[in-house]
């Protein structure tokens, strides 16, 4: 954390260095010819992304066999490895294969806090703008020839959308700016990175400012296999922050961003900071003085651990359950699902409870966090939770199916990896990892007790 200048309110600079692919294999999966598609026909997405035929099938195979980020792919027995090599590059943001030795990559980028009177002044005239449609409409931004305007929800955060963006930028060498929220940033940055191009990010939501645009994670969802399962680590050339974008953001979206920001306050180990964010009014004016500090917390962690080999995992506090709830919500209520931050607010409460029931977090800290979270102005109410989750019966089997596809999982088929607390802002560490393997039976029991106590189960 030593390189981040927290006193410089106009810029945060992140210098990063990491291994690519990110994690050294703990085991190897030997592939043989019977497991690889023979004479595969290129799908439309494979054609648009210029991938070898069989890449999508290889990805499906890896997920169906529950391979993890720490499972290397041994391709030595295969004559044609092109499809598997491409799949390995983006599977859970990259895994090692027998044909590719990890290499060290490094770079630097600035998170700039713009002082322009109008945030639209940060849009470069010479750049291609990949632009959120709502932002375009609310701010009266005229799309020019070469720009791409998209309206994306989690449903459209797919390889198909990435392929559309990839094709759009294929024949130009102009600079690229991505202007919008986290879904657009994740998807467009993934497509641009696949094309080997650099990009600037201009986040227009609090969630994107605090999380999605800081850290280099890009990617898309992959159908039944879950949220953010395909992607690349690809760092922007610059991130431009302007709080004025938040003035047109719906209150619900601001609350969702504050939930993610609260997680950063917990990580900072500063109870006054967490209390401030819990009590903060969900307005652009109230948030503006705190933006630099909110973003600095994640920036410091990214610089230490850019590819989530260790410490960065704590940024996933609350995310294991949250991703499951999001997936379930998008299935049962696709027109108005839970927002990411809303799911995180519930996920943090459950992760805190699981930390307590697993014996890591003492009762007083558990009570403190639960009380603060439940009373926070950003916390989604139970009626809102039920509305956005959709008409779901027998919730646990669906949660279980989702969490066992989580990217953090590395071990037994009966355990999943969780980011748990041992004190306020202190996370349980096992060796170099900041995740804990919890048995399915423990998770089920804790969830059912927690959900009943908090009235999260629909009658």
Predicted segments with their positions:
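ATP/NTP phosphate-donor binding region
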Residues: 4-16, 20-32, 37, 49-51, ...
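C-terminal charged capping/lid subdomain of soluble metabolic enzymes
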Residues: 14-16, 51, 62-65, 72-74, ...
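Glycine-rich beta-strand-to-loop/alpha-helix junction loops that act as flexible
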Residues: 152, 179-181, 317-318
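Structural motif
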Residues: 178-179, 202
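Short glycine/serine/threonine-rich phosphate/pyrophosphate-binding segments
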Residues: 183-190, 209, 324
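A glycine/threonine-rich phosphate-anchoring loop and its flanking beta-alpha core
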Residues: 190-280
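Active-site segments that bind and position negatively charged phosphate/pyrophosphate groups
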Residues: 275, 279-397
């Amino acid at each position: 954390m030593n390189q981040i200048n927290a006193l410089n309110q106009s810029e945060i600079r992140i210098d990063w260095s990491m291994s690519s692919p990110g994690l050294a294999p703990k085991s190897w999966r030997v592939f043989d010819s019977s497991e690889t598609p023979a004479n595969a026909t290129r799908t439309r997405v494979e054609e648009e992304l210029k991938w070898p035929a069989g890449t999508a099938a290889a990805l499906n195979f890896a997920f169906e066999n529950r391979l993890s980020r720490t499972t290397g792919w041994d391709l030595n027995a295969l004559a044609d490895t092109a499809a598997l090599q491409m799949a390995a590059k983006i599977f859970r943001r990259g895994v090692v294969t027998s044909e590719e030795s990890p290499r060290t990559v490094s770079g630097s980028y600035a998170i700039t806090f713009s002082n322009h009177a109008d945030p639209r002044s940060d849009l470069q005239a010479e750049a291609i703008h990949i632009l959120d449609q709502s932002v375009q409409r609310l701010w009266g931004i005229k799309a020019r020839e070469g720009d791409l305007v998209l309206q994306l929800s989690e449903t459209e955060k797919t390889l198909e959308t990435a392929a559309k963006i990839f094709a759009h930028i294929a024949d130009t060498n102009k600079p690229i700016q991505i202007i919008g929220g986290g879904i657009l940033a994740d998807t467009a940055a993934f497509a641009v990175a696949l094309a080997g191009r650099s990009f600037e990010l201009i986040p227009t939501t609090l969630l994107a400012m605090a999380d999605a645009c800081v850290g280099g994670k890009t990617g898309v969802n992959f159908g039944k296999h879950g949220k953010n399962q395909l992607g690349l680590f690809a760092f922007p050339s610059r991130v431009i922050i302007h709080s004025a974008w938040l003035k047109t953001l719906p209150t619900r979206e601001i609350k969702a961003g504050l939930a993610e920001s609260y997680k950063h306050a917990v990580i900072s180990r500063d109870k006054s900071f967490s209390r401030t964010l819990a009590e903060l009014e969900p307005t652009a004016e109230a948030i503006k003085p705190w933006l630099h500090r909110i973003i600095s917390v994640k920036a410091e962690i990214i610089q230490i651990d850019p590819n989530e080999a260790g410490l960065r995992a704590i940024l996933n506090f609350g995310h294991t359950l949250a991703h499951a709830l999001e997936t379930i919500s998008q299935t049962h209520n696709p027109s108005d699902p839970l927002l990411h931050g809303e799911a995180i607010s519930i996920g943090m409460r459950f992760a805190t409870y699981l930390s307590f029931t697993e014996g890591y977090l003492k009762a007083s800290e558990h009570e403190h966090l639960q009380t603060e979270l439940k009373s926070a102005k950003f916390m989604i109410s139970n009626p809102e939770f039920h509305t956005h989750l959709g008409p779901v019966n027998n919730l646990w089997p669906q949660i279980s199916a989702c969490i066992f596809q989580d990217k953090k999982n590395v071990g037994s088929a009966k355990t999943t990896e969780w980011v748990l607390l041992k004190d306020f802002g202190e996370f349980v560490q096992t060796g170099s990892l900041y995740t804990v393997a919890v048995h399915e039976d423990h998770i089920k029991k804790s969830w059912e007790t927690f959900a009943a106590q908090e009235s999260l189960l629909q009658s």
